[in-house]
């Protein structure tokens, strides 16, 4: 099947399929004589695996590790569990940071008069950065990676 059919069947966009090939997450597709990519059922199964892992929030590096474990029939389930538990810990750190941001914003919004006056603690906080949120800078998304 061509890339459009593989995309439709797997639920992964054509653009992402090309990207996953480029970064080595999936094997490069076979090519027809006219250089069109062709995909088989195994490729689509792998793409579905990748899509589901992304839906669960795994990083590309974690997905590479999971794919290697998936393909290794002699794997130990403890290795897979370790990847999952590490990811759960990351998710819990993100949840805690989001909850802290929510508390901070609720506090600031509660102290903002919300009227015609120009003074507003929300703007002052953003300008001065006095509230501390347990975050670090992610070069791709700005403040999003958690400590």
Swiss-Prot record:
Compartments in which it is found: Cytoplasm
CDD domains according to UniProt: HTH_CueR
Gene3D superfamilies: 1.10.1660.10
Any one GO CC term of the record: cytoplasm
Pfam families xrefs: MerR, MerR-DNA-bind
GO process terms (BP): positive regulation of DNA-templated transcription
GO MF entry, a single one: DNA-binding transcription factor activity
Domain HTH merR-type: 1-69
Keywords, ordered alphabetically: Copper, Cytoplasm, DNA-binding, Plasmid, Transcription, Transcription regulation
DNA-binding interval(s): 3-22
Function description: Transcriptional regulator involved in acid tolerance. Binds copper.
Recorded domain comment: It contains a N-terminal DNA binding region and a C-terminal metal binding region.
Protein name from the UniProt record: Heavy metal-dependent transcription regulator 2
